[in-house]
Amino acid sequence: MIRAIVTDIEGTTSDIRFVHQVLFPYARERLATFLRLHAEDAEVAAPLTALRQELDQPQADIEQLIAALYRFMDEDRKSTALKALQGIIWRSGYQNGDFRGHLYPEVAGQLAAWQQQGLKLYVYSSGSVEAQKLLFGYSDAGDLQPLFSGYFDTHVGAKRETASYLNIAGKIGIAADELLFLSDIHQELDAARAAGWHTCQLIRDEADSQSQHPQVNRFDQIDLGEFAS
């Protein structure tokens, strides 16, 4: 029996175009000025220190760090430091009402229904935990943060690595065969399945003929009875 559901965001709960056409450009446009002004702030200094370690350049100055971050954005690198800094910048955008977190129409209602059935809900995304909370806290459907019991990002590992799902199961404290992972990327689902999880693939756009996972187009098409242990 499924006791907890862990969901991805991009392409799963939310249109990937919101991330790539709204969030990413918003942070990119403001990144350099923001870092020059706030590099000494504690919440900014910490990811910059992590970035120096990632680059193996402990003496890198702010301009070198800015250049590296733009390179990471061009490469779509899943850098934990970059994701943290983007999340800080996005926070002001959400709070100022510049945008709201996109959700597919059925997502909020189905998440609420699952919670009412007694399931625990979690998020696992390559975006920082801060960014995840902002998207759901300032979503099209209002503040959905009370629906979730926890959030995971790349601090637990990369999404295509089996160890990441073992880590999450350990932190949640629920057996792998009672966990369901929702994602649009079959390689991520492969890793979760290898860790003993149940899996379901969201097909929001193009079909994925390479996948070996159950597929649905919407959250309200997911039948938890099909995932009995």
Curated annotation (Swiss-Prot):
Q: How is the cofactor bound?
A: Binds 1 Mg(2+) ion per subunit.
The UniProt keywords, alphabetically, are: Amino-acid biosynthesis, Hydrolase, Magnesium, Metal-binding, Methionine biosynthesis
Q: Matching Gene3D superfamilies, A to Z?
A: 1.10.720.60, HAD superfamily/HAD-like (3.40.50.1000)
Keyword Metal-binding among record annotations? yes
Q: What are the recorded GO MF terms, alphabetically?
A: 2,3-diketo-5-methylthiopentyl-1-phosphate enolase activity; 2-hydroxy-3-keto-5-methylthiopentenyl-1-phosphate phosphatase activity; acireductone synthase activity; magnesium ion binding
One GO term (biological process): L-methionine salvage from methylthioadenosine
Enzyme class per UniProt: hydrolase
Instruction: Kindly indicate whether the keyword Metal-binding belongs to this entry.
Output: yes
Q: Which cofactor does it need?
A: Mg(2+)
Q: Which family does it belong to?
A: Belongs to the HAD-like hydrolase superfamily. MasA/MtnC family.
Please describe what this protein does: Bifunctional enzyme that catalyzes the enolization of 2,3-diketo-5-methylthiopentyl-1-phosphate (DK-MTP-1-P) into the intermediate 2-hydroxy-3-keto-5-methylthiopentenyl-1-phosphate (HK-MTPenyl-1-P), which is then dephosphorylated to form the acireductone 1,2-dihydroxy-3-keto-5-methylthiopentene (DHK-MTPene).
Its subunit composition reads:
Monomer.
Protein's recorded name? Enolase-phosphatase E1
Q: Which organism is it from?
A: Serratia proteamaculans (strain 568)
